[in-house]
Swiss-Prot record:
Name the record gives this protein: Large ribosomal subunit protein bL34
Species this protein is from: Carboxydothermus hydrogenoformans (strain ATCC BAA-161 / DSM 6008 / Z-2901)
Gene: rpmH
Molecular function GO terms recorded: structural constituent of ribosome
Listed InterPro entries: Ribosomal_bL34, Ribosomal_bL34_CS
Keywords from the UniProt entry: Ribonucleoprotein, Ribosomal protein
Length: 44
């Protein structure tokens, strides 16, 4: 059986990227919380 994680940069950006996060209210909350927490990286 093959492993389930087969990394692809395009999918990574499309699914977890900044623009995708900004599209939904929940995603904006994620960005906001990560800013407040002081994360170096906000999104993938």
């Amino acid at each position: 059986m093959k492993r389930t994680y087969q990394p692809k940069n395009r999918r990574r950006k499309r699914v977890h990227g900044f623009l995708k996060r900004m599209r939904t209210p929940g995603g904006r909350n994620v960005i906001k919380r990560r800013r407040l927490k002081g994360r170096k990286r906000l999104t993938a």
